[in-house]
Amino acid sequence: MENVNLTPKDIVNKHFKQKMRGYDSIEVDEFLDDVIQDYETYAKENQRLQMENDRLLKKVDELTKQVAVGKTGTTARPVSNASTNMDILKRLSNLERHVFGAQLNDDVNRGNRF
């Protein structure tokens, strides 16, 4: 907590001079007790939020690294996918030639019989 002038202890330990016709010291003490409780609550909440912020920043760093690693991995995949697709196309072409080539030979042979 930067630029904080008072801590809860400072508020508790603060003593005011008493003058005639001044404020009721009991009322001031009760009010300061409430201020101290609120101040401590805000300090705890601030600390909790800072810890959560640190945790989330670490998580962002981890996820950013994972994305960076994932991007390098995906650039390598299309090359392997392209070679796999080319291999599949070659096999399909050979299979078609074999199947349809045999049918063409059968059709030619049948045609000669008629």
Swiss-Prot record:
Cellular component terms (Gene Ontology): cytoplasm
Location in or out of the cell: Cytoplasm
Secretion signal, residue range per the UniProt entry: none
Lineage top rank: taxon: Bacteria
Coiled-coil ranges from the UniProt annotation: 32-69
UniProt keyword Transcription regulation, yes or no: no
GO BP terms in the entry: cell division; regulation of cell shape
Keyword Coiled coil: yes
Pfam families in UniProt: DivIVA
UniProt entry keywords in alphabetical sequence: Cell cycle, Cell division, Cell shape, Coiled coil, Cytoplasm
InterPro entries in alphabetical order: Cell_cycle_GpsB, DivIVA_domain, DivIVA_fam
Record-stated family: Belongs to the GpsB family.
Subunit: Forms polymers through the coiled coil domains. Interacts with PBP1, MreC and EzrA.
Biological role: Divisome component that associates with the complex late in its assembly, after the Z-ring is formed, and is dependent on DivIC and PBP2B for its recruitment to the divisome. Together with EzrA, is a key component of the system that regulates PBP1 localization during cell cycle progression. Its main role could be the removal of PBP1 from the cell pole after pole maturation is completed. Also contributes to the recruitment of PBP1 to the division complex. Not essential for septum formation.
Name by which UniProt lists this protein: Cell cycle protein GpsB
Gene, per the UniProt record: gpsB
